[in-house]
Amino acid sequence: MFKNTFQSGFLSILYSIGSKPLQIWDKKVRNGHIKRITDNDIQSLVLEIEGTNVSTTYITCPADPKKTLGIKLPFLVMIIKNLKKYFTFEVQVLDDKNVRRRFRASNYQSTTRVKPFICTMPMRLDDGWNQIQFNLLDFTRRAYGTNYIETLRVQIHANCRIRRVYFSDRLYSEDELPAEFKLYLPVQNKAKQ
């Protein structure tokens, strides 16, 4: 999808405020929902994915199962709200041995397991909104001893709220981020005593 696109800086694949946030995504829902709601903490539209079973309610990009993203930027960043329920996401990458590998992170696992085509790992989320930064270059090298070439697919499962999902060429400090990539929390007016 993005193979022939010049890639530098930031490349967003989901923005909850956009007119069609799931334009390039496919949805699967069983015993749950995927809908856009206003989150009270940030007073803004977000995408909520909820389901009784994490494996049967998810969004996947690209929508066409025969297509791949072709994103070469090595950092995946997701702005996600912890709903204090089971949550998992998966990223499929291509390495320099021309092997498709999957990384699956979830908040209900306690150990990392590396198998030839999939690496599953635990993920700890703080209360409220989190910025998940995933260094695909480093994970591919550490898990498989190979070099990351590109990201083929991203799949985000229940249960979470999503503000944005993007790729970047490096990790950026809060000051360096473009305004629309920051998560603004409303300023609390504290009464003077």
From Swiss-Prot:
Q: What is its main location?
A: nucleus
Does Nucleus show up as a keyword for this record?
A: yes
The chain's disulfide connectivity reads none
GO cellular component terms given for this protein: axonemal B tubule inner sheath; axonemal microtubule; centriole; ciliary basal body; cilium; extracellular exosome; motile cilium; nucleoplasm
Q: Which Pfam families match?
A: CFA20_dom (PF05018)
Cytoplasm among the record's keywords?
yes
List the subcellular locations. Answer: Nucleus; Cytoplasm, Cytoskeleton, Microtubule organizing center, Centrosome, Centriole; Cytoplasm, Cytoskeleton, Cilium basal body; Cytoplasm, Cytoskeleton, Cilium axoneme
UniProt keywords (A-Z) are: Cell projection, Cilium, Cytoplasm, Cytoskeleton, Flagellum, Microtubule, Nucleus
**Gene Ontology molecular function, alphabetical:** RNA binding
Q: Name one GO biological process term.
A: cilium assembly
Which family, according to UniProt? Belongs to the CFAP20 family.
Q: How does it assemble?
A: Microtubule inner protein component of sperm flagellar doublet microtubules.
Summarizing the function annotation, the protein's role is: Cilium- and flagellum-specific protein that plays a role in axonemal structure organization and motility. Microtubule inner protein (MIP) part of the dynein-decorated doublet microtubules (DMTs) in cilia axoneme, which is required for motile cilia beating. Involved in the regulation of the size and morphology of cilia. Required for axonemal microtubules polyglutamylation.
- According to UniProt, the name of this protein is Cilia- and flagella-associated protein 20
